[in-house]
UniProtKB/Swiss-Prot annotation:
One Pfam family hit: Ribosomal_TL5_C
Keyword annotations of the record: Ribonucleoprotein, Ribosomal protein, RNA-binding, rRNA-binding
GO molecular function, a single term: structural constituent of ribosome
Protein name, per record: Large ribosomal subunit protein bL25
GO terms for biological process, alphabetical: translation
Gene label: rplY
Domain of life: Bacteria
Length: 195
């Protein structure tokens, strides 16, 4: 997994301070770690937006003004309901051997049998919550869809973990991740064959 350096500035929590930060192109955020005091910081909105909207998960080295780097990942991001701008972010610090839960984007590999038959591929879960060491986390969680047929789905429990030793998927086991929908044409053709 790629490591990104992101500069942060400590901030003071005061009434209306968050709105002033946002107007000046900064995003209020917090940095926390088990057993340590939460630190309020601000981050350049443009840099954070690029990072959040990339299709990969990252380990982030937060760089403080004194030059210290603290290894973290994004735990939560809050968006404005109308403008979709980032209004707040939470970063979780971690140590090398610590077990954490992290959201990782899903990507697919292979050509689905069902799509070749005219079906439509639908990714239902665009990300999965994985538990393990942050250094074991992939940038993408790749799922092979080669055997996925028409009107079938791949559920969380059916995803092989051989390429991801030491990681566990924390999402609901019965949740569908990817499906191939039969189009109206395929449904009508199946009905004609059945009659």
């Amino acid at each position: 997994m790629e490591t990104i350096v992101l500069g942060v500035e400590p901030r003071v929590i005061k009434k209306n301070e968050a709105e002033k930060l946002r107007k000046s192109g900064l995003v209020p955020a917090v940095v926390y770690h088990k057993g340590e005091e939460t630190v309020a910081v601000s981050i350049q909105e443009l840099a954070l937006t690029k990072l959040v909207h990339s299709a990969e998960s990252h380990i982030i080295d937060l760089q403080f003004p004194d030059g210290k780097l603290k290894r973290s990942f994004i735990k939560e991001v809050q968006f404005h309901p109308v403008t979709d701008r980032i209004i707040h972010a939470d970063f979780q610090l971690f140590s090398a051997d610590e077990i954490v839960e992290m959201v990782v984007p899903v990507s697919v590999s292979g050509e689905s049998v069902g799509v070749e038959k005219g079906g439509k591929l639908q990714i239902i879960m665009h990300s999965l919550t994985l538990k393990g060491k942050p250094t074991d986390m992939p940038e993408h969680f790749v799922i092979d869809i080669t055997a996925l047929d028409l009107a079938h789905s791949i559920h969380v429990r059916e995803i092989p973990m051989t390429n991801y030793p030491g990681l566990t998927i924390m999402d609901e086991p019965d949740a569908p991740v990817i499906t191939v929908l039969a189009t109206r044409k395929e449904v009508e053709a199946a009905a004609e064959v059945a009659s």
